[in-house]
Amino acid sequence: KRGRLIAISTYVELLPVYVIFLFSSGSTLTFRERDWILITDFENLTGNPLFEKSLYTAFSLSISQSRYINVLPRSRMLENLDRMNSADRTTVDEPAGKEIAVREGIDLYIVPGISEAGSNFAITSKIVETASGNIVKSQVMYADTRDDILSTLDQLSRKIRRDLGESRYNIASQDKPLKKVTTSSLEALKLFSQGIDC
């Protein structure tokens, strides 16, 4: 009986800690719930054109599952490129992303990237402060094969949502694997992305 009472007492003591762990924001960034974020196109250092637009589409879709974060729509970014008289009106690289973020009054933007790391793929992200250009958070995760890239994007998306202050509880309840909410084919995602940019 004494052992059971100790166990119950320990559980009661730890419960508030667990609740704080589950629901706390855990962020020091200047981002509030329902603020806007801009995601640039992927910095593709692999030379594989398959990744040019497909990964942006998958990554933005993954983060857009969050009701905590507002992701600036692709259509709005392309409208800005038109107004900027950009030479390339379908590509949002880091400089273009920064200018669009300034125009839209967005405090932070995300620059994702992919490169080859031996036989693996390195998936990276930078959260950049628009006003200063400073990188305030950066992440790198690895996919063993091309087939693992979407699941790695899922992991990266969850980490970024956490970095922006979303609680673990909200992330767990608003997070479906990309392979369930869209196609698992990067080729199909690329074709879909090209249709959006036309």
Regions found by a protein language model. Give the residues of each.
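Acidic, proline/glycine-rich low-complexity intrinsically disordered segments
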Residues: 4-198
